[in-house]
């Protein structure tokens, strides 16, 4: 779905982990992101059922997935798993997926929580929010979502 320049878009972002997947929601017009929920990564069926419910509820125009990398920019053990998850999201829900370098997002999320700006039980969702905020901060004002 293509949106005219300056139109509002809803986005969901994911911080993929083997045990938990942090989810955040954001808005392209306000360029703001917030932690939403943590999905337990119990099985493929459970994961995609939970994500499907979130997509049905929030009706996002696009998805963002954090891409784990080592500090020097080389692929991390989780890089391929996160890419696969994003590809599966695209295939199952027919929504565009953008991958964002998530180096230090968990470190930033922990710092936010220590500073009193988040909840410890929402660490993964806080990391997803940081990933999404990085994406939103990089958007031009006339970006179109396809």
Curated annotation (Swiss-Prot):
GO terms for molecular function: nuclease activity. It is found in: Cytoplasm. Keywords: Cytoplasm, Hydrolase, Nuclease, Ribosome biogenesis. The keyword Membrane does not apply. It comes from the Bacteria. SMART domains: YqgFc. It holds the Pfam family RuvX. One of its GO terms (cellular component) is cytosol. GO terms for biological process: rRNA 5'-end processing. The keyword Disulfide bond does not apply. Its EC number is 3.1.-.-. Could be a nuclease involved in processing of the 5'-end of pre-16S rRNA. Belongs to the YqgF nuclease family. This is Putative pre-16S rRNA nuclease.
């Amino acid at each position: 779905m293509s949106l005219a320049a300056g139109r509002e878009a809803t986005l969901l972002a994911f911080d993929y982990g083997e045990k938990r997947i942090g989810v955040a929601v954001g808005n392209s017009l306000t360029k703001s992101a917030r932690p939403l929920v943590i999905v337990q990564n119990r099985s493929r069926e459970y994961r995609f059922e939970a994500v499907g419910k979130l997509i049905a509820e929030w009706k996002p125009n696009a998805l963002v997935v954090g891409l784990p990398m080592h500090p020097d920019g080389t692929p991390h053990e989780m890089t391929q798993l996160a890419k696969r998850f994003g590809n599966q999201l695209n295939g199952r829900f027919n929504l565009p997926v953008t991958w964002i370098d998530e180096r230090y997002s968990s470190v930033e999320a922990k710092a936010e929580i220590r500073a009193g700006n988040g909840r410890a039980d929402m660490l993964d969702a806080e990391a997803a929010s940081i990933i999404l905020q990085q994406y939103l901060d990089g958007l031009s004002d006339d970006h179109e979502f396809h």
